[in-house]
Amino acid sequence: MPYILPRSFCDTKQNVNIISQASDLKPGSRKVCVAIGMFDGVHLGHQQVIRQTIEDARQHEGIAVAITFDRHPNSVVAPDRNPPLIYSLSQKLRVIESLGIDTTLLIHFDKEFSQIPGEEFIQGLARDCGAIHSLCVGSAFSFGHKRSGNVVLLKRLGQELHFIVHGLASVSLDGRTVSSTRIRESIGAGNLDVASQMLGRTYALAGTVIRGDQFGRQLGFPTANLDPHDLVIPPNGVYAAHAQVQGRFHRAVVNIGTRPTLQNPKPKLQVEAHLLDVSPDLYGQEMEIAFVEKLREEQKFSSTDALQQQIQRDIEAARRLF
């Protein structure tokens, strides 16, 4: 899959309409069309659910609402099975909005929320949102305390509360189901093209730029150090990449790894981006990195001089790709 800067990576809009409780929606006389899901990665299957909701809203002059969560439910109910996320929360919200959703209801998923039975959750949603016209989910969607709710329950509640339920079948690509789990596996294995195909856009890693130990600057190659909190990370190595930060795009060389040349007794996985030709102050900013090509594996060098020389070769190799 050729590298493309897709709309979702290029979209720098920050005017996402987000509410934290259903009673804040205030649709007036408009019908409410709802999509519900974790939507990690907002992949092709998620997009199908969201677009069905948008279509319903447009056909009935309603409002399209996405309901999602601020963390993975497993982080609360099953921490030992909590997966790393594909997207940061801000990434996810931006991509959902870019699809055409009018409002996103972002639910804080905590212990108290996890105890709400599925039926009670939907009844409360219908009460607080006003006139729900339709509710769209994936066919395998489950919800409520101990995952007690499913599409069958939704359809029963839809009959009682007078809303339409869409339980959409999963999307397949090359004969296999598109899922967040498969995308995480692809990213972790370095199959970023496969992940991008399932996402429907070029995969990008996001995180906040944090203060590092200035080692790159000492070598003459200052880096923006990323804190990709709780996210799945591509394999260790050196990559040519594009970085988006503060609404601007920069060519970059990115190192993912533990910097073995430094012989740190407590090595820590780091994501470091050297932006070519610029060295802005980016601390505290969110950066997105879209990987163009892996240049080499991470390796241990005999000296910092040897490391400097290799970094210069990496930069030259990256420039030839842009």
Explain the meaning of each model-derived region.
Residues 43, 96, 135, 195, ...:
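Residue-level signal for inorganic ion chemistry
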Residues 212-322:
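Phosphate/ribose-recognition catalytic cores of enzymes acting on nucleotide-derived substrates
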Residues 26-88:
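N-terminal catalytic cores of NTP/NDP-binding nucleotidyl/phosphoryl-transfer enzymes
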Residues 158-257:
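Glycine-rich, Lys/Arg-enriched anion-binding loops that position phosphate/diphosphate groups
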Residues 2-32:
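Positively charged, low-complexity intrinsically disordered leader regions
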Residues 66, 106, 165-168:
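A structural preference for short, hydrophobic beta-strand core positions in alpha/beta folds
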Residues 75-161:
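N-terminal Rossmann-like or analogous alpha/beta NTP/dinucleotide-binding catalytic cores
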